[in-house]
């Protein structure tokens, strides 16, 4: 399924991510930029997810362009069973990937890959391009 965002879109990326958070066993997120405005859309669900001792959250982000907000990282650092890695290299390697992976012990894992960083506009009304792929639809 393709998510393009924008004000006329019925489905938002954040609403789909919230649905997947509720049924995941492990979550891996890689985004260039992590903003508090985007984290707030998912924070309650992530907090509940991380309260389960069987679950794990891993996030990779960067300080590239100074856009990632320290307050967002501080909020994530307070979550149980959460690992946050930050790339500080702004000269040689510029991490620009965006992916949200929801692993399930059942084998029904889901990935969202595209252009959306973790920001409010990228997850709600911004013009983005993301595709959802599921292990069931794409077993290889």
Model-derived segments and spans:
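PLD/PLD-like phosphodiesterase catalytic module centered on the HKD motif
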Residues: 1-140
């Amino acid at each position: 399924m393709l998510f393009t965002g924008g004000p006329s879109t019925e489905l938002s990326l954040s609403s789909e991510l919230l649905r997947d958070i509720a049924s995941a066993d492990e979550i891996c997120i890689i985004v260039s930029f992590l903003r508090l405005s985007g984290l707030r859309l998912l924070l309650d669900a992530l907090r509940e997810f991380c309260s389960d001792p069987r679950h794990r959250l891993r996030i990779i982000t960067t300080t590239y362009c100074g856009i990632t907000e320290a307050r967002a990282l501080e909020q994530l650092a307070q979550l149980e069973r959460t690992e946050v890695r930050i790339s500080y290299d702004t000269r040689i390697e510029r991490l620009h990937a965006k992916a949200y992976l929801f692993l399930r012990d059942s084998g029904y894992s889901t990935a969202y890959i595209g252009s959306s960083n973790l920001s409010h506009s990228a997850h709600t009304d911004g013009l983005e391009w993301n595709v959802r792929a599921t292990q069931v639809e794409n077993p290889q």
